């Protein structure tokens, strides 16, 4: 064979190899490409409380089986989302309960403008105005309302032949009549900031919703303004006059400042107080106990009636969704279901009526709320101003009014001065540094990297062979960033995450892992792949079929787990789930239940804390 022929053969062979390589590459997805595809197909929803994870989230997923939704329990704190925004980790959909446009201002440019959407158009203008920025844009939409007003023992009124209040004057008369028979007419749990804040605003809801009131509120909440905004001199002086009058008429004293929720509930249950300020949920609770209870609104001194409301939470969407039409469409579908009547009915407490700010949700009031039907139909549901400043300053100033330290004029000046004062710098001591960001999207081949980091780190903190955690244990916020104490603490789910440690055999561990993966009676049942548990110290294989999950294998140190192995196991779960998950009493208890957040905080305070590396802990087939 001559050289020319040999070269031709070699060239043809090389071309064949290259061609096969190209074809093979087109037919096989790399692991990285698969993960990118999973990321693109996933819509992440951060929930403000774990309560929503158990009923609300599964319903939303059930209505959108073709959308992969990953629900993560975040924090009820806008500072948490500001931190995620600053470090490239803002989720697709955010929910927050403790909320104000004032505190949300730094997030505005990162959020979608929902003003022209059908979802925003369905909200009554009266309420939508509370969410409009000064430029007319709308970034946040409210779900249904938690109604606060006066919980009233009607049986006591009938027993002492005292007329039920119909206006402010008759409310005061009722308080005076009860005092004559040795019963408090009214009190509330004024040890809490929100009770102080809501009483102050509720008594002046009529004035705060006037044109002047809305003008001030818009200026106070304007995200474009960097100047601190105090109280106006048109609406607010009168608000403190009404608060002072209310304190005088109800005979509130410094002793009331020590009352907490349990104290007030006990007084009401024992017939020691006729009325208290609280949630409408109390009506059903006391009726179930045989106490004839009704709900009443605030009686404004101008004759109007108002209910104080706070949305159970507000929803916002990440503006980055607008860069991908398919992802935006999926997110809007999720938003639509989140705001639906059926979904919102899963938010409210047992026995509460669904009070929606949306015209798409019909008004159906039960016996518990029939006395305020006219108030609701008039759209007199006042949405509180709930900035961090208003919580803190209301607690300070209203408490001093109740204690007799401030007159109305002094209270107004003190409140205004505190709003205008420069903020005290936050404690920015760095307690943890993460050198890289980890994905918090669940991947079929490996699980969630950020959750794995937290599970592996906590396995070291607890000094345990194996750690099992429900998926809602972590907030997924492993970012390339420096963490101060507050943000580091927020890496753990905030709502009562407990730990329990035991020594188990391999056989007992298998059954425990099975309960975490497949669900168990009385416990949490995973409803999508993102809700599957997180494990450390072992790796698991899980089969997915028709929305249910089956444990098919466990390995430890690369080898199948043996039934006669002995291991220490630490389980993390919400308090109400722990008993069901460990109902078999598998193994021997080594440690009592502890709060994970406290253990994590103690670990960070010791200095030198570091995050572990992620591992592939789950294979989903």
Question: Over which residues does each language-model region extend?
Answer:
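Conserved N-terminal structural module of periplasmic/extracytoplasmic solute-binding proteins
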Residues: 4, 26-101, 410, 422-425
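C-terminal capping/gating helix-and-loop segments adjacent to ligand/active sites or protein-protein/ligand interfaces
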Residues: 51-52, 70-71, 133, 309, ...
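Extracytoplasmic "Venus flytrap"/periplasmic binding protein-like
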Residues: 62-126, 155-166, 267, 274-275, ...
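Extracytoplasmic/periplasmic substrate-recognition and gating elements
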Residues: 68, 287-350
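Hinge/lid segment of periplasmic solute-binding proteins
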Residues: 97-148, 163, 172, 198-199, ...
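Extracytoplasmic/periplasmic solute-binding protein
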Residues: 139, 172-228
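Glycine-centered hinge/linker elements that transmit conformational signals in sensory
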Residues: 218-257
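Catalytic centers of hydrolytic enzymes
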Residues: 427-621
């Amino acid at each position: 064979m001559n050289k020319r022929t040999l070269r031709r053969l070699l060239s043809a062979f090389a071309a064949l190899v290259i061609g096969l390589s190209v074809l093979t590459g087109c037919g096989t997805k790399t692991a990285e490409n698969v993960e990118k595809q999973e990321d693109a197909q996933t819509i992440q929803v951060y929930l403000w409380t774990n309560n929503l994870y158990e009923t609300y989230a599964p319903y939303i997923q059930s209505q959108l089986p073709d959308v992969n939704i990953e629900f993560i329990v975040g924090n009820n704190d806008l500072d948490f989302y500001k931190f995620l925004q600053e470090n490239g980790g803002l989720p697709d959909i955010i929910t927050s309960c403790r909320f104000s446009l004032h505190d949300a201002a730094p997030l505005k440019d990162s959020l979608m403008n929902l003003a022209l959407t059908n979802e925003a158009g369905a909200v009554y203008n009266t309420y939508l105005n509370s969410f409009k920025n000064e430029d007319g844009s709308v970034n946040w939409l409210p779900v249904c309302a938690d109604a606060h007003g006066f919980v009233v023992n009607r049986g006591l009124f009938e027993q002492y032949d005292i007329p039920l209040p119909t206006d402010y004057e008759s409310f005061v008369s009722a308080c005076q009549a009860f005092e004559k028979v040795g019963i408090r007419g009214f009190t509330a749990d004024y040890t809490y900031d929100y009770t102080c804040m809501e009483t102050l605003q509720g008594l002046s809801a009529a004035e705060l919703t006037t044109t002047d009131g809305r003008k001030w509120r818009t200026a106070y909440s304007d995200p474009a303004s960097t100047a601190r905004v105090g109280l106006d001199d048109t609406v607010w002086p009168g608000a403190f006059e009404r608060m002072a009058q209310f304190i005088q008429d109800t005979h509130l004293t410094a002793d009331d400042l020590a009352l907490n929720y349990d104290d007030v509930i006990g007084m009401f249950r024992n017939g020691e107080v006729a009325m208290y300020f609280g949630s409408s949920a109390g009506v059903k609770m006391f009726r179930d106990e045989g106490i004839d209870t009704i709900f009443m609104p605030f009686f404004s001194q101008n004759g109007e009636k108002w209910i104080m409301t706070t949305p159970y939470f507000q929803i916002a969407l990440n503006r980055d969704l607008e860069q991908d039409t398919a992802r935006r469409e999926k997110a809007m579908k999720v938003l639509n279901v989140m705001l639906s009547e059926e979904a919102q009915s899963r938010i409210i407490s047992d026995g509460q009526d669904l009070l929606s700010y949306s015209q798409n949700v019909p008004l159906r009031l039960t016996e518990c709320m029939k006395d305020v039907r006219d108030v609701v139909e008039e759209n007199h549901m006042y949405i509180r101003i709930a900035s961090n400043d208003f919580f803190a300053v209301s607690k300070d100033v209203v408490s001093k009014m109740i204690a007799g330290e401030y007159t109305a004029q002094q209270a107004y000046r003190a409140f205004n001065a505190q709003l205008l004062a420069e903020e005290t710098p936050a404690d920015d001591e760095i307690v943890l540094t993460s050198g890289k960001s980890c994905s918090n999207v669940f991947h079929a081949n490996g699980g969630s990297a950020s959750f794995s980091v937290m599970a592996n780190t906590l396995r070291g903190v607890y000094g345990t062979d194996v750690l099992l955690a429900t998926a809602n244990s972590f907030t997924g916020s492993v970012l390339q960033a420096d963490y101060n104490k507050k943000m580091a603490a927020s890496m753990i789910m905030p709502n009562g995450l407990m730990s329990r440690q035991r020594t188990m055999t391999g056989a007992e561990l298998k059954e425990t892992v099975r309960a975490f993966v497949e669900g168990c009676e009385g416990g949490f049942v995973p409803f999508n792949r993102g809700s599957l548990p997180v494990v450390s110290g072992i790796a698991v294989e899980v089969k997915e079929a028709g929305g249910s999950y089956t444990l098919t294998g466990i390995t430890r140190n690369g080898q199948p787990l043996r039934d006669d192995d002995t291991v220490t196991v630490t389980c993390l779960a919400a308090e109400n789930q722990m008993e069901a998950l460990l109902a078999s009493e598998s193994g021997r208890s080594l440690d009592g239940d502890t709060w994970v957040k406290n253990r994590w905080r103690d670990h960070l305070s010791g200095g030198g804390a570091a995050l572990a590396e992620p591992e592939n802990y789950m294979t989903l087939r």
